[in-house]
């Protein structure tokens, strides 16, 4: 992908400035985890047994740990290292909790963590076709992110998307009780089908109507299924989230209390009530009668 600078309608190609050291990438990420992916930085060079994790982070949206590894070279196995580190996390959960509490001066409890949503991210200027193919499974908790640096201090960070036809890792033969077997049993990568299964045709049709309406609001919106809801994100931020119920949809709009103009009073203030997704505004819908109006509420968040 080429990056251009635009000055007075004249485009100039910005040259890539390769990172000389992995530490440069690591430092950039660790100082900007909240901006890059809404993560909390926990520890750099976290030692566990005979291993050293480059960056340990925590995702407060899903209450799970995230391991981040940085690679400048391309001659390594993302599957082998990824599975090893994820298995390490599952085997030594207490060590991860202690490190979080000591580093973040917190009091995180074991039952507050959803270990099933743990994952590892590999960050590199480039990945080989083999590396991309070896992680192209819809339910594998290993992600590849490409990072590049250009002139004028421009940085691009692009998570590599799995193909829509990506198979399940469970279809791949592997030894029972192996590290890969344990990881695939205990970690879950949620997809849209997980939320659509066993729902009535009426609810599925209702969801499709709202989903399509939301996606037409901006080409930047992407669907990101979580354990309890389907999030529609713009970059790293949730804009709106949907939970499919038996006969209706529960919708959360990601705006702080007082920041949403809702003259029809369709939404409910949940700022002081426990709820699943992000945002202080919640509503339940069982038809498309107010679809256009609800989209006007979502649009306020997009334009804020």
Model-derived segments and their meaning:
Residues 1-218, 222-248, 256-258, 268-270, ...:
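Charged, terminal alpha-helix-loop-beta segments
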Residues 254, 263-266:
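Short, surface-exposed loop/helix-turn segments at secondary-structure junctions
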């Amino acid at each position: 992908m080429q990056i251009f600078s635009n000055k007075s309608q004249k485009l100039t190609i910005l040259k890539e400035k390769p990172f000389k050291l992995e530490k440069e990438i690591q430092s950039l990420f660790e100082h900007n985890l909240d901006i890059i992916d809404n993560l909390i930085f926990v520890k750099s060079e976290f030692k566990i047994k005979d291993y050293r994790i480059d960056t340990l982070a925590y995702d407060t949206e899903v209450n799970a740990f995230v391991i981040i590894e940085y690679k400048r070279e391309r001659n390594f196995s993302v599957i082998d290292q990824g599975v090893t580190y994820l298995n390490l996390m599952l085997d030594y959960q207490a060590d991860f909790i202690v490190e979080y509490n000591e580093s973040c001066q917190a009091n995180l409890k074991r039952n507050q963590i959803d270990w099933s949503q743990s994952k590892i991210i590999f960050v590199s200027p480039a990945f080989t076709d083999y590396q991309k193919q070896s992680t192209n499974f819809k339910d594998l908790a290993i992600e590849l992110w490409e990072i590049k640096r250009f002139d004028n201090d421009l940085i691009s960070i692009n998570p590599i998307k799995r193909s829509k036809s990506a198979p399940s890792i469970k279809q791949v033969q592997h030894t029972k009780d192996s590290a890969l077997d344990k990881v695939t049993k205990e970690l879950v990568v949620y997809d849209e089908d997980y939320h659509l299964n066993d729902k009535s045709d009426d609810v599925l049709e209702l969801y499709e109507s709202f989903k399509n309406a939301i996606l037409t609001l901006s080409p930047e919106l992407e669907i990101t299924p979580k354990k309890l809801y389907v999030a529609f994100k713009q970059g790293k931020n949730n804009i709106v989230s949907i939970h499919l119920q038996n006969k209706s949809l529960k919708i959360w709009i990601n705006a702080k209390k007082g920041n949403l103009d809702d003259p029809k009073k369709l939404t409910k203030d949940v700022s002081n009530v426990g709820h699943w997704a992000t945002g202080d505004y919640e509503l339940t819908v069982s038809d498309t009668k107010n679809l256009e109006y609800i989209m006007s509420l979502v649009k306020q968040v997009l334009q804020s």
